[in-house]
Amino acid sequence: PIHMFDMMRFLFGEVESLHAIGSTHEYKEVDDFSVLLKFANGMHATLATAADASWLFPFERVEVFCHHATLLTREMESLTCSSNVEGHFTVQTMHQLPREERWGYVQEDRAFIDSIVNNSPPLVTAFDGLMAVRIADAVYESVRSNKPVVIKQ
C-alpha cells in the first residue's frame, strides 16, 4: 500500500490525517487495513488492502469520483471515464503496451534522465519517499490507538 499512498499524494496533494482499522488473518503482523485519509485540500479518500487476498485480478484499482464524473483503473490494463450523469463512458485499454510502459517505468526513467540532462528538479524527491513512509507509519499507529493520526509534514 505504500505505493498507493505515494500515488494518492501525487494525485490529490498532502495527507493531513488518517484513521485506520486493521486485523490479522494470515500473518503475525496486521495484514488487512481499511484507511480513511483526509487531505489538506479538504478531499478525502479510502484505501482497503488485504495481504491475504486471492490472486484474482485486478490486484490494484483506483476509483475517483467527483463532479458527476468517475475515473476507474484496473491493474493498469484499462482506464474507464464517465463525465456526465447520463452514464456515457469511454474505456481506454493498455494491455497491448509492454508492461514497462503500461506500469509507468519507461516514463519514470525518462523523467529521471531528463532531470539530469536538463539540470532540472526531479519529479519525485526524497521528501516524497519520506511522506509515504510517514503515512504508512501513521496507519499502524492509528490501528494500535484506534484514533485518527495527524501526519507530520
Show the residue positions of the predicted features.
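Contiguous beta-strand/loop segments that form the cofactor/metal-binding neighborhood of enzyme cores
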Residues: I2-S78, R102, V106-S120, K152
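Short secondary-structure transition/capping segments
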Residues: V30-D31, N84-E86, A136-D137
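Alpha-helix boundary/capping detector
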Residues: S34-V35, L71-T73, T90, A138-S142
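C-terminal helix-rich "cap/oligomerization" subdomain common to oxidoreductases
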Residues: A40, A111-Q153
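A short, polar/proline- and glycine-enriched secondary-structure boundary/capping micro-motif
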Residues: L56-R61, S82-G87, V91-T93
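Juxtamembrane helix-loop transition sites at the ends of transmembrane segments
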Residues: A69, N84, N146-V149
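C-terminal "lid/loop" region of Rossmann-like NAD(P)-dependent oxidoreductases
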Residues: V91-E101
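Generic alpha-helical structural signal
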Residues: E101-R102, L130
